[in-house]
Amino acid sequence: MTGSLPQAVQDVADISAVSQLVLRERVSRDLGLWEQMRDCFHDDSVVRISWINATGPEFVRRSKEMAERNVKASHRLGPIFVTLARDRAIAQLNAMVDIPFTLKGTDVIVTSHT
């Protein structure tokens, strides 16, 4: 964001915008809204999580492939910590990922804490 706001106010607005972007991306992923998820990433963005270190667009592609293989997951997010770095930002957060499946005829949910 740019404008004539005092720097502290601008920083708070930028942190809020990044936090909302992270939430929109996660909800889009959990609901399978792939185009909306893709819109959350710049082409040169980087995603570093437990199973991938790639660009944002590659992360979306691989997430969609997982969903197409019926690997479903839902995310419960912790607080989002945003660090502003000139024209970029770093968002960090913990999450719990719930993965439902059937094991020997019994429905189970495995929860991964990150």
Tell where the protein language model's regions lie, with residue ranges.
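A solvent-exposed, acidic/Ser-Thr-rich amphipathic alpha-helical stretch
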Residues: W34-T102, T106
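Short, low-complexity N-terminal intrinsically disordered segments enriched in polar/charged residues
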Residues: M1-L31, D39, D43
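Outer-membrane beta-barrel transmembrane domain signature
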Residues: V108-T111
